[in-house]
Amino acid sequence: HNGHLNILEKAERVFDKVIVARGINPEKAEAAGQNPWPAVLQFRQHEEFAGLLTDYLATKEEHADVTLVRGLRNGDDLDYEVNQLRFMEEMKPDLKVVFIRCDKQFEHISSSAIRNLEKINKGLGDKYLPKF
């Protein structure tokens, strides 16, 4: 959605290379490859991984210096991310993380809110998705 794109564009201004990585969640209905990547990622490097994010990052570190970028909308997101970071740092103490805050106009947008809008009325969430 537009909030994710905003964070991605900011990360691309900071880092030489950005890989969008999507974890495969076994708790969700869609299997690997069934949930298509958005068109906005067509010319950007993107990968899916199974297992722990820290393990995925370790495989990437075999070939490059890696920094995990996490997007934030508000203080609630920060609280959640800091808690998650504590777990990840126990598994990977050398983890490097950068938090990037989205622009104000995207603070209210979340994937779950868009999914809920779509359940109510197909196409209702489209206004929060990038137009290409």
Each PLM stretch: what is its role?
Residues 2-132:
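Nucleotidyltransferase catalytic core that binds NTPs
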